[in-house]
Amino acid sequence: MKDFAAIDFETANSERSSVCSVGIVIVRNGEIVDSYYFLIKPEPEYYSYWNTQVHGLTMEDTMNARVFPEVWAEIAPKIEGLPLVAHNSPFDESCLKAAFQMYQMDYPDYQFFC
């Protein structure tokens, strides 16, 4: 696979919809061509101790961040047509689907690989 987008979500709490950050690396022809990192205001908006221990993010970090639909509107054109690759793809795919559902957005049929 020479063209793909590597993606990684972090969540604020045990709710998969509570994405608080996303990192994306775009690879074309086997070369990294772009990378992005966005803080996201989570929904529901609270942080659990254990999640913060994993990623170090707190409510203060995302207090003024954009909500998921605004961030995804910027990301979607950058990953259009690319398979999504994640270290723990079941988790990351479930986060993406949950965020789409939380905001009543139509979920495109993204193809995930691990």
Outline where the language-model segments fall.
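Conserved non-catalytic scaffold segment of RNase H-like nuclease domains
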Residues: 1-109
